[in-house]
């Protein structure tokens, strides 16, 4: 792999965004023990847009994504410095209630991880944990979120069946429905379609495009075609650095950084 000058970056600040900034980071650093895995990442995420995080394996994109709702807190000997700004609050502060913050910034993981419960209970579990007992409200949330996740028509007559009986693609859409049941502002997605077949992947992509009408979405993907199809903005990561951030169409046609050009053209990664 070529050596790149990591001091040269092209991070396009959204000084006049079409929509407000939903989430941003300022000089974000992540350390695993003595290893620095993320270097001074400063990015902005526009509300009601999909931003793709791309880069080779080990580039830091998933580390960065997990930082956005402090999932890295669960990893031993991990330290995060810098600011993560949400609603004018630095959610990287020790004073922030992490669990309450995650109600606003939800996450969907790479592999479907439904609970060993019914389809209905998968979606209502967190709501019930927060004290919601109104059956009518819970029923409405189940129907609404399953429709948003393009799953309602397939499961509306089997809501009491185990979620584990669903196909992989259906399970992932259930996990999306479960994530939005808490009505978050932001959805973080770590390669949500990488374990799915092409038809299921297409369905998930169509679902995400619809969901951005109501949610801000940040997605890690290794699939360049997927990033080009569904995202409005793209951030390119290399060796723990966010090197380039721009509108997706510009990133894929006129990248400013040599490393980004090599990656999107398939010369490495």
Swiss-Prot record:
What's one GO-annotated cellular component? plasma membrane
* Mode of membrane association: Peripheral membrane protein
Location within or outside the cell: Cell membrane
| Cross-referenced SUPFAM superfamilies | P-loop containing nucleoside triphosphate hydrolases
Disulfide cross-links? none
List the catalysed reactions. Answer: phosphate(out) + ATP + H2O = ADP + 2 phosphate(in) + H(+)
Amino acids binding ATP: 55-62
Domain ABC transporter intervals: 23-264
Q: Which SMART domains match?
A: AAA (SM00382)
Q: Which GO terms describe its biological process?
A: phosphate ion transmembrane transport
- EC number(s) on file: 7.3.2.1
Q: Which domain of life is it from?
A: Bacteria
Q: Which GO terms describe its molecular function?
A: ATP binding; ATP hydrolysis activity; ATPase-coupled phosphate ion transmembrane transporter activity
- Keywords in alphabetical order, please: ATP-binding, Cell membrane, Membrane, Nucleotide-binding, Phosphate transport, Translocase, Transport
* EC category: translocase
Cross-referenced PANTHER family, in alphabetical order?
ABC TRANSPORTER I FAMILY MEMBER 17 (PTHR43423), PHOSPHATE IMPORT ATP-BINDING PROTEIN PSTB 2 (PTHR43423:SF10)
Q: Which family does it belong to?
A: Belongs to the ABC transporter superfamily. Phosphate importer (TC 3.A.1.7) family.
Q: Whom does it interact with, and what assembly results? A: The complex is composed of two ATP-binding proteins (PstB), two transmembrane proteins (PstC and PstA) and a solute-binding protein (PstS).
Q: In UniProt terms, what function does this protein have?
A: Part of the ABC transporter complex PstSACB involved in phosphate import. Responsible for energy coupling to the transport system.
UniProt name for this protein: Phosphate import ATP-binding protein PstB 1
**Gene that this polypeptide is encoded by:** pstB1
């Amino acid at each position: 792999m070529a050596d790149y000058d990591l001091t040269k970056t092209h991070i396009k600040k959204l000084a006049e965004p079409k929509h407000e900034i939903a989430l941003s980071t300022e000089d974000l650093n992540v350390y695993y023990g003595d290893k620095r895995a993320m270097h001074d990442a400063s990015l902005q995420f526009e509300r009601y847009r999909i931003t793709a995080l791309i880069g080779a394996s080990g580039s830091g994109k998933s580390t960065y994504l997990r930082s956005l709702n402090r999932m890295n807190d669960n990893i031993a000997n991990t330290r995060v410095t810098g600011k993560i700004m949400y609603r004018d609050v630095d959610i990287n502060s020790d004073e922030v209630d992490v669990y309450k913050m995650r109600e606003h910034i939800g996450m969907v993981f790479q592999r479907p991880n439904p609970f060993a419960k019914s389809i209905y209970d998968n979606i209502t579990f967190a709501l019930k944990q927060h004290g919601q007992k109104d059956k009518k409200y819970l029923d409405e949330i189940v129907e609404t979120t399953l429709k948003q996740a393009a799953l309602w028509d397939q499961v509306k007559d089997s809501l009491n069946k185990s979620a584990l009986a669903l196909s992989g693609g259906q399970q992932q859409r259930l996990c999306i429905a479960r994530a939005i049941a808490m009505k978050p502002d932001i959805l973080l997605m770590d390669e949500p379609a990488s374990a799915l077949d092409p038809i299921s992947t297409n369905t998930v992509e169509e679902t995400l495009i619809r969901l951005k009408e109501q949610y801000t979405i940040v997605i890690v993907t290794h699939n360049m075609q997927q990033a080009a199809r569904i995202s409005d903005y793209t951030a390119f990561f290399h060796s723990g650095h966010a090197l380039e951030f721009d509108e997706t169409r510009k990133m894929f046609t006129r990248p400013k950084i040599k490393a980004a050009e090599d990656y999107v053209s398939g010369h490495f990664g």
